[in-house]
């Protein structure tokens, strides 16, 4: 295929797609140029069905440092494992694409998005999502797209599609919405306590823009799209299915209807093991043994799936007996751990999260160096999900994509209510340890995080709570579920997480397994989530109604002092000599920013106070009118130099020693004398003139003495004064 170029204008920027020039051996590839961002999306598919019981889709988003004109850090000077932002972007693209493959599709599919050039004002992640959908759509891979995604900002009462970097900073909303032409199928958002109405309108505005991008994709697909390949889908034997359903459906239904999770799991597993053993024995020598046993497992899964959905849609009963809008029993506790800076334990049914707060000096902030300009990240929320939380064994090691994603969701939800850096100059880390899980563990971590922050004395604007909403839909009728548990998440159609305060929403995340949901469902889910959120906040506020006024005794105390920008170098000293000496003497930690804000951290308040005194004396400036107890340090013919404080001296001119004429300075003063002086002048070079006589009562004057004084002033006037100043400079 020869190179073909397709162009349009989207959200005020040129969007160009090039097909047929690069990555021609992939099943499908698209080079997307949006503004000055360039992303190559390439899709490939395995030739055979995989043997696993899931769809092996892998979406990668690769940030090349050269794309932003940056050199890789580290010893190897080469890109390594994906950054957290790259991992989150890959998840963002995966989520709207995954539901668009047929049920039973098991061929491995891989989509690689490589950022080749980066423009902060033209969203590379959205270009990658567009390119991923297009690469799959024009290929022979049986993808039921296209899909597209956009970012939405909200500022000055207006919605902005794919905002610039500056618009994002000013926005009250950071929303990514994706979907098909017909419906929304993925949402990810952080917001500054916005109402449900504003959020819903943002979703609808975003979907309008999504449809515009899909229309552009359809134009390209019509021109260059390949015929879709015929692939084998995982389908069970109809006769075998009828036999197993007829014999064992009643037993499985009875097991599924047990309300307590562990007992239900044991009973359900017992039925499955009995059926599996029967067919294993019957077909042990059969030539299609493996296929038959795979079908048996799939049929049992489908039976359980059908019964859970039937209970909810027909009987209006959930597996644990709750109403559709009922939350599981709640419990909240603070100060669960000693010694730490703050802790909160939150339990919702059989889901439990422990959140632990740590405060640190701003020097411990995380440096984020991606394709954007390097910046310091003050707040971190980390989420850990050990396998024991669900009573299983499994991989134990570095966090995976799911844990990174859940941590980021909690971070967005809680970041909106944190105090400003000026009001609370600490680095803040929350770690959520999921101790039990039966659904909605990410939202439990948000609630536990709120408890830990308030217990630790972090002055958050308001407590935040989170809830997960679910959906069971048969295409015509639907039921929205509040506080979904694991079974409802696994067999349901939607996982819609909503976090916020009483004032509004701070975070959203939606994943679905069907092709999309309507605005009506979104509106109903948001309203139901608000009611549930308020119930949870009632429980949290009964335990701790407001943040504590003091930090934990183990937390580092902090005080601040501000110096002029041109004084920063004095505090730091040559090669850091001065600040190192202060730290060694007092044992504190010190952070200085470029605006002259100095934060001093220590568990010892006396050490903080001593440090403030030292810094204040280093940057202290004499001001006209101030009075000092000074010491004479040098005698000259034209006056005496006196030491005011630290490295600051002043000149007391011979004419400023007394009201009567002084013939010789040595007649009145000697080195080491203690004198009281008043600052009378500070010139633009920082040279200080002081006076002793200004603090003495002025004697009455005769006409003769007035003439003598006038002559004395003239005698000590400009020439000698200037000469004296030259010596002073030296």
UniProtKB/Swiss-Prot annotation:
Reactions performed catalytically: RNA(n+1) + phosphate = RNA(n) + a ribonucleoside 5'-diphosphate
Keyword entries, A-Z: Cytoplasm, Magnesium, Metal-binding, Nucleotidyltransferase, RNA-binding, Transferase
UniProt binding sites for Mg(2+): 489, 495
GO CC list: cytosol
One GO molecular-function entry: magnesium ion binding
EC number: 2.7.7.8
PROSITE patterns referenced in this protein's UniProt entry, alphabetically: KH_TYPE_1 (PS50084), S1 (PS50126)
Record-linked InterPro entries: ExoRNase_PH_dom1, ExoRNase_PH_dom2, ExoRNase_PH_dom2_sf, KH_dom, KH_dom_type_1, KH_dom_type_1_sf, NA-bd_OB-fold, PNPase
Localization of this protein: Cytoplasm
Region (Disordered): 691-730
Biased composition (Basic and acidic residues): 700-730
SMART domains named in the record: KH (SM00322), S1 (SM00316)
Annotated ranges, domain S1 motif: 625-693
Chain ranges of the KH domain: 556-615
GO annotation, biological process: mRNA catabolic process; RNA processing
Cofactor requirements of the protein: Mg(2+)
Function: Involved in mRNA degradation. Catalyzes the phosphorolysis of single-stranded polyribonucleotides processively in the 3'- to 5'-direction.
Family, similarity comment: Belongs to the polyribonucleotide nucleotidyltransferase family.
Protein's name in the database: Polyribonucleotide nucleotidyltransferase
């Amino acid at each position: 295929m020869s190179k073909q170029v397709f162009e349009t204008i989207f959200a005020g920027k040129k969007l160009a797609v090039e097909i047929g020039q690069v990555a021609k051996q992939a099943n499908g590839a698209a080079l997307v140029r949006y503004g000055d961002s360039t992303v190559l999306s390439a899709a490939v598919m395995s030739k055979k069905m995989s043997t696993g019981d899931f769809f092996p889709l892998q979406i990668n988003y690769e940030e090349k440092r050269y794309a932003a004109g940056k050199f890789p850090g580290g010893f190897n000077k080469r890109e390594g494992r994906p950054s957290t932002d790259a991992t989150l972007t890959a998840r963002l693209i995966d989520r709207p694409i995954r539901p668009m493959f047929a049920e039973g599709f098991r061929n491995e599919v891989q989509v690689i998005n490589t950022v080749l050039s980066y423009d902060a004002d033209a969203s590379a992640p959205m270009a990658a999502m567009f390119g991923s959908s297009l690469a799959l759509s024009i290929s022979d891979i049986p993808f039921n797209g296209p899909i597209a995604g956009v970012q939405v900002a909200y500022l000055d009462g207006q919605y902005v599609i794919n905002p610039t970097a500056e618009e994002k900073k000013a926005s009250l909303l950071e929303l990514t919405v994706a979907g098909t032409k017909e419906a929304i199928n993925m949402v990810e958002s952080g917001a500054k306590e916005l109402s449900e109405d504003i959020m819903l309108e943002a979703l609808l505005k975003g979907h309008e823009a999504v449809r515009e991008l899909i229309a552009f994709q359809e134009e390209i697909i019509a021109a260059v799209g390949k015929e879709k390949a015929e692939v084998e889908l995982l389908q069970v034997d109809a006769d075998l299915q009828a036999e197993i359903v007829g014999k064992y459906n009643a037993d499985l239904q009875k097991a599924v209807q047990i309300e307590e999770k562990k007992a239900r799991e044991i009973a359900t597993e017992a039925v499955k093991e009995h059926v599996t053993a029967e067919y294993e024995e019957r077909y042990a020598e059969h030539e299609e043994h493996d296929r038959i046993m795979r079908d048996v497992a799939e049929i049992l899964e489908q039976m359980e799936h059908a019964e859970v959905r039937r209970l909810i849609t027909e009987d209006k009963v959930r597996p644990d007996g709750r109403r559709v809008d009922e939350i599981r029993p709640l419990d909240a506790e603070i100060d669960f751990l000693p010694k730490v800076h703050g802790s909160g334990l939150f339990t919702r049914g059989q889901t439990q999260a422990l959140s632990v707060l740590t405060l640190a000096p701003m020097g411990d902030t995380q440096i984020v160096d991606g394709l954007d300009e390097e910046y310091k990240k003050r707040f971190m929320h980390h989420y850990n999900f050990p396998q024991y939380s669900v009573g299983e064994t499994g991989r134990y090691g570095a966090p995976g994509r799911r844990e990174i994603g859940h941590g980021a969701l909690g971070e967005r939800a809680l970041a909106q209510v944190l105090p400003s850096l000026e009001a609370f100059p600490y680095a803040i880390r929350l770690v959520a340890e999921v101790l039990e899980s039966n659904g909605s563990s990410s939202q439990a971590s948000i609630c536990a995080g709120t408890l830990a922050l308030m217990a630790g004395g972090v002055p958050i604007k308001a407590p935040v709570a989170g809830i997960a909403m679910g959906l069971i839909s048969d295409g015509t009728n639907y039921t929205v579920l509040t506080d979904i548990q694991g079974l409802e998440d696994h067999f349901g159609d939607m996982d819609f997480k909503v976090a916020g305060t009483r004032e509004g929403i701070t975070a959203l995340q939606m994943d679905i397994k069907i092709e999309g949901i309507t605005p009506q469902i979104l509106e109903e889910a948001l309203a139901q989530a608000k009611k549930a959120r308020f119930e949870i906040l009632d429980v949290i506020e009964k335990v701790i109604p407001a943040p504590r006024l003091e930090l934990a005794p183990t937390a580092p105390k902090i005080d601040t002092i501000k110096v002029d920008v041109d004084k920063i170098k004095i505090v730091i000293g040559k090669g850091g000599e001065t600040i190192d000496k202060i730290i060694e003497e007092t044992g504190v930690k010190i952070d200085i920013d470029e605006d002259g804000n100095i934060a001093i951290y220590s568990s010892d308040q006396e050490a903080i106070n001593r440090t403030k005194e030292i810094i204040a004396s280093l940057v202290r400036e004499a001001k006209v009118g101030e009075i000092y107890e000074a010491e004479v340090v040098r005698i000259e013919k034209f006056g005496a130099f006196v030491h005011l404080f630290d490295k600051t001296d002043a000149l007391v001119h011979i004419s400023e020693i007394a009201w009567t004429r002084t013939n010789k300075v040595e007649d009145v003063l000697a080195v080491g004398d203690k004198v009281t002086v008043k600052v009378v002048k500070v010139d633009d070079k920082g040279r200080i003139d002081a006076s002793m006589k200004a603090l003495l009562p002025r004697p009455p004057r005769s006409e003769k003495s007035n003439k003598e004084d006038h002559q004395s002033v003239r005698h000590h006037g400009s020439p000698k004064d200037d000469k004296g100043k030259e010596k002073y400079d030296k």
